[in-house]
UniProtKB/Swiss-Prot annotation:
Pathway entry: Cofactor biosynthesis; biotin biosynthesis
E.C. no: 3.1.1.85
NCBIfam families reported in the protein's UniProt record: bioH, PRK10349.1
Record protein name field: Pimeloyl-[acyl-carrier protein] methyl ester esterase
Keyword Membrane tagged: no
UniProt-annotated catalytic positions: 82, 207, 235
Function: The physiological role of BioH is to remove the methyl group introduced by BioC when the pimeloyl moiety is complete. It allows to synthesize pimeloyl-ACP via the fatty acid synthetic pathway through the hydrolysis of the ester bonds of pimeloyl-ACP esters.
Catalytic function, reaction form: 6-carboxyhexanoyl-[ACP] methyl ester + H2O = 6-carboxyhexanoyl-[ACP] + methanol + H(+)
GO terms, biological process: biotin biosynthetic process
Organism this protein belongs to: Shigella dysenteriae serotype 1 (strain Sd197)
Lineage: Bacteria, Pseudomonadati, Pseudomonadota, Gammaproteobacteria, Enterobacterales
Keywords in alphabetical order: Biotin biosynthesis, Cytoplasm, Hydrolase, Serine esterase
The family this protein is said to belong to: Belongs to the AB hydrolase superfamily. Carboxylesterase BioH family.
UniProt key word Manganese: no
Location in the cell: Cytoplasm
Amino acid sequence: MNNIWWQTKGQGNVHLVLLHGWGLNAEVWRCIDEELSSHFTLHLVDLPGFGRSRGFGAMSLADMAEAVLRQAPDKAIWLGWSLGGLVASQIALTHPERVQALVTVASSPCFSARDEWLGIKPDVLAGFQQQLSDDFQRTVERFLALQTMGTETARQDARALKKTVLALPMPEVDVLNGGLEILKTVDLRQPLQNVSMPFLRLYGYLDGLVPRKVVPMLDKLWPHSESYIFAKAAHAPFISHPVEFRHVLVALKQRV
């Protein structure tokens, strides 16, 4: 059985697991990990097939969640960014006793646009899948550029994301394709109506991948959850607004 790359730091009385997004790895959290580890016992994870978690092929969302959970603390706040938000949500649905609170960051329960639902057009996701086989490094870079577009620090933030990708070996094409397939097909809108733990959803007002118009729709669908929008952030608010991001998480800790 292959192991997930996992790093634990800090000695807070609350565990916080951080799950990164598509194409990236746990190095993306380095902009906030020192500060967070003074408040939490922090767990940095490379999702299966990404970063240092080698030897995994394409996986379903359920299998990815189970693989991550095998090395996790008994109970933690689970925070997932983008694709990682789906993994954290899946864990909250299947193992609620392990989840002290669920936090999703720039994530959607259904990334793909559907009838009366805003998201990424399916042909855009299919296009990324096609381009991966032609020039996957350039495709990943294009996807990263989309994530920071519109912010005051867009170039700087895009460079930070690119540096994270290039710091470690690139994921295999089938792993990247598998991640895109999850983004294209998964829809957790109805299942997440049933979670009972504290549920905080964080968004960037300028996010081009998760439109802000879904926020009030989910406020209505999930009245038990809370939402918070970073006014000048795009898809990676923890990179563009690290201090504000940390304050939001520390405030959550006081409540759970």
